[in-house]
């Protein structure tokens, strides 16, 4: 079976995590220019109002995929499998052996942004700075729901497999 690879055309990490002062949420932060996509949830906070969450936004070239189906490069009808390959970046923090990543199709367009700061979350998108964040999908245009709106019928959950190379 032939394999066809598609790379994301844009990406961003958005979060509602607390900033270093532990009083302010980083809901305006943007990490669109970072070369790392950070997925986290603070242990023990998953069901509380103080939960700190992150979401990774990825956009793939859907028009290219559609064109490849029409051209017969990939099957024009029936099932086609898509796999998302991720890697663990080296860092000093301890990771759980196993955690679940949920993949959902975002239902609204969004801007990538130019933020880099994943520690103190100081790169914020505002009316004059493009990019998505926890509350806005672009500059000053809000998501339908904080944290991004997605198609609930397009949902996949999968376990990560540790890759310690």
What are these regions (language model features)?
Residues 1-165:
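Secreted, disulfide-rich extracellular signaling modules
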């Amino acid at each position: 079976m032939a394999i066809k690879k598609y790379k994301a055309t844009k990406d961003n990490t958005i979060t509602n995590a607390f900033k270093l002062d532990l009083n302010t949420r980083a809901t305006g932060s943007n990490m669109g220019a970072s070369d790392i996509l950070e997925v986290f949830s603070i242990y023990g906070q998953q069901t509380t109002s103080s939960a700190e969450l992150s979401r990774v936004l990825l956009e793939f070239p859907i028009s290219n995929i559609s064109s490849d189906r029409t051209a017969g490069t990939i099957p024009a009808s029936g099932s086609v499998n898509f796999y998302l390959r991720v890697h663990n970046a080296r860092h000093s923090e301890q990771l759980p052996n196993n955690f679940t990543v949920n993949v959902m199709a975002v239902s609204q367009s969004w801007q990538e942004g130019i933020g880099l700061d994943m520690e103190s979350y100081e790169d914020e998108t505002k009316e004059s700075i493009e990019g998505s964040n926890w509350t806005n999908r672009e500059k000053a245009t809000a998501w339908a729901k904080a944290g991004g709106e997605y198609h609930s019928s397009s949902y996949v959950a999968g376990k990560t497999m540790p890759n310690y190379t």
